[in-house]
Structure formats: C-alpha cells, structure tokens
Amino acid sequence: MTKKICIAIDGPAAAGKSTVAKIVAKKLRFVYIDTGAMYRAVTYIAQKNNLAYEDETAIAQLLQKTVIRFEPGEVQQVFINDENVTEVIRSLEVTNHVSIVAAHPAIREALQERQQIFATEGGIVMDGRDIGTAVLPNAELKIFLLASVEERAERRFKENVAKGFAGDLNQLKKEIEERDHLDYTREHSPLKKAEDAIEVDTTSMSIEEVANKILSLAEQKINN
C-alpha cells in the first residue's frame, strides 16, 4: 500500500505550480488541492456581491456562509455552494485582484483551516504561496518552484492565447511583478521558501521534467 504523504508545492504566480501538482497527484493517485482556486473563488464572490476587494470584514463574513468544494474532472471542477465557477474564477478581473483579497489575514486564516482539514488523511498534493510554511508545515515533501519573470509572463501569455484571450506580453510582465511584490511583502503568511523545502528553478525545464523531478523526490519519501 502506498504511504500517504503530504506534498506542498509553493512558488510565485505562473511558476507552473498547478500544472505540475496535477500531474504529480495523478501519477501518485493522490488528491490535488488547488488553494489558488480557493482564493480566486473568494475574490469572485466579492466581485459578484459588489464588495470592495479591500473590505476584509465584509468578505470574511460572506466566506463564513460559503461552501467551496472541488470535484474531479479532466479539469478539476470548482464549486461555490452549487455554482460551478471553474471558468469564471480564471477571469482577468479575478486574476488582477486575487492578491488583494489573499492578503487579508481573516481570509487566509479561514481558508488555511479548510485546507488543513483537506489534508488530515494524507495522500494529497497542495499548491499555493504558503503551504510549506503556514498550511502544512509538517508536510513530508516541500517544493519551492521558481522561474524568471520573463519565463512566467511567456507561460501566462501562451495560456491566455490558448483560452482565446488577447494579451500584451509586457503588460503581463508588469502584472506578474506587481503580484510578486504583493505576495512577498504581505504581512500575513507572505510567499517564502520553507527552510526544509527543495528549490526547483523551472526556467529552462519542461513541465514533464519538473513533474518527474518531484515524483522522484516523492517516491524517495514514500519508500523511506
């Protein structure tokens, strides 16, 4: 029987966390938890309810009444209560404001509690900004993915084109730099590498190479 470890994958925006985490989870037959989608879902409910993204109290109160759940699929399906929000939480409006909502301590605390509940049984791969430091500090394997701003902007640009969005590469670079600044400097659970995390610079690596490296590390932990 496979040992059910917890794998934490952290890193900045567009470093390839979600794509790699999904591949790793599928290969190991673990559950994938997309914490970024949870923050996007909260940003979307703020937008839908005409709340200011800076209004921490109002958003936190709304979150208390909200169920966020995942269902498996070719693309993991995200639901807010019974509404499928898988596509809408990837909108440019949500993308450009999620770092503001994610910086609120009340939101981070509420979502971290939910994320820790998901992980109680083990056998999960969770990606985000603070998984190895705040959400799963005892995860058996912690990975910190890095890539240059240029590389990350190129990846995001290609993703947007594939989805039918027109994009401006220089604007994407600017947006990624702004998100990095917000993520690294926020007061509550900033983006940082856990002391025991293994750093992987993905700049010149394919998604498959990154996934295979993490799978090799995971198998060492599982077989230990």
From Swiss-Prot:
<dbReference type="GO" id="GO:0036431">
    <property type="term" value="F:dCMP kinase activity"/>
</dbReference>
<comment type="similarity">
    <text>Belongs to the cytidylate kinase family. Type 1 subfamily.</text>
</comment>
<dbReference type="InterPro" id="IPR027417">
    <property type="entry name" value="P-loop_NTPase"/>
</dbReference>
<dbReference type="InterPro" id="IPR011994">
    <property type="entry name" value="Cytidylate_kinase_dom"/>
</dbReference>
<dbReference type="GO" id="GO:0005524">
    <property type="term" value="F:ATP binding"/>
</dbReference>
<dbReference type="GO" id="GO:0036430">
    <property type="term" value="F:CMP kinase activity"/>
</dbReference>
<dbReference type="GO" id="GO:0015949">
    <property type="term" value="P:nucleobase-containing small molecule interconversion"/>
</dbReference>
<dbReference type="InterPro" id="IPR003136">
    <property type="entry name" value="Cytidylate_kin"/>
</dbReference>
<keyword id="KW-0547">Nucleotide-binding</keyword>
<keyword id="KW-0418">Kinase</keyword>
<feature type="binding site">
    <location>
        <begin position="11"/>
        <end position="19"/>
    </location>
    <ligand>
        <name>ATP</name>
    </ligand>
</feature>
<keyword id="KW-0963">Cytoplasm</keyword>
<dbReference type="GO" id="GO:0005829">
    <property type="term" value="C:cytosol"/>
</dbReference>
<protein>
    <recommendedName>
        <fullName>Cytidylate kinase</fullName>
        <ecNumber>2.7.4.25</ecNumber>
    </recommendedName>
</protein>
<dbReference type="GO" id="GO:0006220">
    <property type="term" value="P:pyrimidine nucleotide metabolic process"/>
</dbReference>
<dbReference type="Pfam" id="PF02224">
    <property type="entry name" value="Cytidylate_kin"/>
</dbReference>
<keyword id="KW-0808">Transferase</keyword>
<keyword id="KW-0067">ATP-binding</keyword>
